[in-house]
Amino acid sequence: MLLAAVLQAAALAVLLTLTPRLAAARWCSRAPASALLLWQALGLAGGLLALEVAATAALAPAGPDHLAALRALPRPLPWWALAAAAVGTAVLARLLWVLVRSTVRTVRLRRRHRLLVDLVATRNPLLRETSVVDSAHPVAYCLPGLRPRVVVSRGVLTALDEDELRAVLDHELAHVVQRHDLVVLPFVALRATFPRLPAVCAAVEQVALLVEMLADDRAARRHDRGVLARALSKVGGAQAPAGGLGATTSGVLLRAARLLHPAPPLPHPGRLAVVLAALAVALLPVAGVIVPLA
């Protein structure tokens, strides 16, 4: 089982090494959905492998049979087995606690902000179900959830023409329909658990950028790409409030350039290769459990 722990640690190290390469890969902007799937697989596999390393090391003295290991651990336990078990338990508990805390905090923030928007915002029948807040600062964002809201400021209505405004609104509706908030939330919790790990910080940044690209692509199906890029540049300094997703929160210049000078989509064989790679990465933790049983 010590060999299994070494193999699991090696697999985790490989994932951490590959993260910067994936963050710098240019093909991701050509297939954001496929890239996002791969990032999700990396996040899942990395978190589970970190737990498996500690658990496998803790059970190593008892041999390869996990059930027998629970009954046959030596008394007293070696200090390193106790340390490994404590670290694994602490990491798991912190990860679950941060995930629950982040989820509850985000839900509360959105509920509070939604109530505030309903109190102070006005509705414009020409803008569908969009809430308009009285602020000169140009900002557009959505509040996802069971009762979503798309919010724009009067500054946006002043800064954008009609076509640009409708493009931005469709971008925000894409976040709502595709539930991008559920994609981002686990990575935010992972960063809160491992705040000093560069690979985790890179993953959060890239996932945020990719969901914005997906929303851009959905909006670009109904609107001119140049119009959307121009709208992003006009409100590019805005920041969505906590709990919200905004059209201008991640990589505005990169996204505008992508809209104005679109690269050809990643060919189907390339997308298939990415999906297979994501599947292989997601199965690494399963292999980490099977190997000790072999």
Language model feature labels by segment:
Residues 9-12, 42-45, 84-90, 277:
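Hydrophobic alpha-helical transmembrane segments of polytopic
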Residues 268-276:
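Membrane-interfacial entry segments at the cytosolic side of transmembrane helices
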Residues 18, 22-35, 84, 92, ...:
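Polar-ligand-bearing catalytic/cofactor-coordination segments
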